[in-house]
From Swiss-Prot:
Function according to Swiss-Prot or TrEMBL: Small subunit of the glutamine-dependent carbamoyl phosphate synthetase (CPSase). CPSase catalyzes the formation of carbamoyl phosphate from the ammonia moiety of glutamine, carbonate, and phosphate donated by ATP, constituting the first step of the biosynthetic pathway leading to arginine and/or urea. The small subunit (glutamine amidotransferase) binds and cleaves glutamine to supply the large subunit with the substrate ammonia.
Biochemical pathway: Pyrimidine metabolism; UMP biosynthesis via de novo pathway; (S)-dihydroorotate from bicarbonate: step 1/3
Active site: C246 (nucleophile), H329, E331
GO biological process: 'de novo' pyrimidine nucleobase biosynthetic process; 'de novo' UMP biosynthetic process; glutamine metabolic process; L-arginine biosynthetic process
Keyword Ubl conjugation: no
Gene3D superfamilies membership: 3.40.50.880, Carbamoyl-phosphate synthase small subunit, N-terminal domain
Gene Ontology cellular-component annotations: carbamoyl-phosphate synthase complex; cytoplasm
Span of domain Glutamine amidotransferase type-1: 171-356
Keywords of the record: ATP-binding, Glutamine amidotransferase, Ligase, Nucleotide-binding, Pyrimidine biosynthesis
Protein name, UniProt field: Carbamoyl phosphate synthase pyrimidine-specific small chain
Length: 364
């Protein structure tokens, strides 16, 4: 069955439908990763977006029961060059087409994904919608341009209530702005006693949990749409060691007086080089964000990492308080694990802060 992708600039791409028959609407973005489509589809940071995968053949290893980054996918659609209908992998439980049908996600294959990606790189991320091949294009465009995409997607993807993931180590409050399970897995590997909490928790409620450390997760959308989280971070900063990832990094920056802005087409892929300024070392990182920290002037923040490709800010630390954040994903899922050590650095920061606190008490 034929299906079209119609973009707000009037461009039309026609190909073959797979997945569900829904005609979803969303922001059309692209991801340059060669593998990891299962993790991409289940990453809550893609909430409200139609994802184009630039690698030409997708679905080769099917969908397994282990590699999901969330229980419910929030992506609005998938666009690929060619669908593999006969996957080959011992863990495969479903084909990609079967999974999309189960989760009611529309797919489009057989279009020029290179052309679409170049268009997004030139024009920036575009609003788009799926449509049947016999629909009037002008009517589809009118509907597309009259529809405003939802904001504050964090409220859609965050946990509704707090829940524990017990361990014998440091107690970590993990604020869920659209958390990937990979972050929780990394904390569990380090035997942390984790409490996952909703995005709209207050500073007072966080501190009542008596955490050794606070982690700010990834998530979708504009960080300025989550003012309650910014206020919460202001309330806990300096009282408990803090580590933020992706959206958590942006929210931390805003709480410290920095600014953020929307990028032209964002960073989405598992091959983005990032340079650590203190050492000069370069790591390949997994990234998925459409906003960036644009200015830290007149703040107590210091840039620790930058993107090699465009010099955007990829890491921050507070000059005097135990807090640091990164824009990329050290948990990968999917992607390289070059930055996995940052979870260990977080635990070390907690231990150092505890020792300094004990020393202060002994000297008092």
């Amino acid at each position: 069955m034929k299906r079209r992708l119609v973009l707000e600039n009037g461009a039309v791409f026609e190909g073959e439908a797979f997945g569900s028959l829904e005609h979803n609407m969303g922001e059309v973005v692209f991801n340059t990763g060669m593998t990891g489509y299962q993790e991409i589809l289940s990453d809550p940071s893609y909430c409200g977006q139609i994802v184009t995968l630039t690698y030409p053949l997708i679905g080769n290893y099917g969908i397994n029961r282990d590699d999901f980054e969330s229980i419910t996918p929030f992506v609005k659609g998938l666009i690929i060059k060619e669908l593999c209908e006969l996957p080959s992998n011992w863990r495969s439980a479903y084909t990609l087409d079967e999974y999309l049908k189960m989760k009611n996600i529309p797919g489009l294959q057989g279009i020029d994904t290179r052309k679409l990606t170049r268009m997004i790189r030139t024009a920036g991320a575009l609003k788009g919608t799926f449509a049947s091949s016999d629909e009037d294009i002008e009517a589809v465009l009118k509907r597309l341009n009259e529809t405003e995409l939802p904001r504050n997607q964090v409220s859609q993807v965050s946990a509704k209530t707090a829940y524990p993931s017990p361990g014998r180590g440091k107690r970590i409050v993990l604020v869920d702005f659209g958390m990937k399970h990979g972050i929780l897995r990394e904390l569990n590997k380090r035997k942390c006693d984790v409490i996952v909490v909703p995005y709209n928790i207050t500073a007072e409620e966080v501190l009542q949990l008596k955490p050794d450390g606070i982690m700010l997760s990834n998530g979708p959308g504009d960080p300025k749409d989550v003012p309650e989280a910014i206020e919460m971070i202001k309330g806990v900063l300096g009282k408990v060691p803090l580590f933020g990832i992706c959206l958590g990094h942006q929210l931390f920056a805003l709480a410290c007086g920095a600014n953020t802005e929307k990028m032209k087409f964002g960073h989405r892929g598992s091959n983005h080089p990032v340079k650590e300024l203190a050492t000069g070392k370069v790591a390949l990182t997994s990234q998925n964000h459409g906003y960036t920290v644009s200015s830290i002037s007149k703040t107590e923040l210091e840039v620790t990492h930058i993107a090699i490709n465009d010099d955007t800010i990829e890491g921050l630390k507070h000059k005097t308080l135990p807090a640091f954040t990164v824009q990329y994903h050290p948990e990968a899922s999917p992607g390289p694990e070059d930055a996995n050590h940052l979870f260990d650095r977080f635990i070390e920061m907690i231990e150092t802060t505890e020792k300094e606190g004990e020393a202060v008490c002994q000297n008092a």
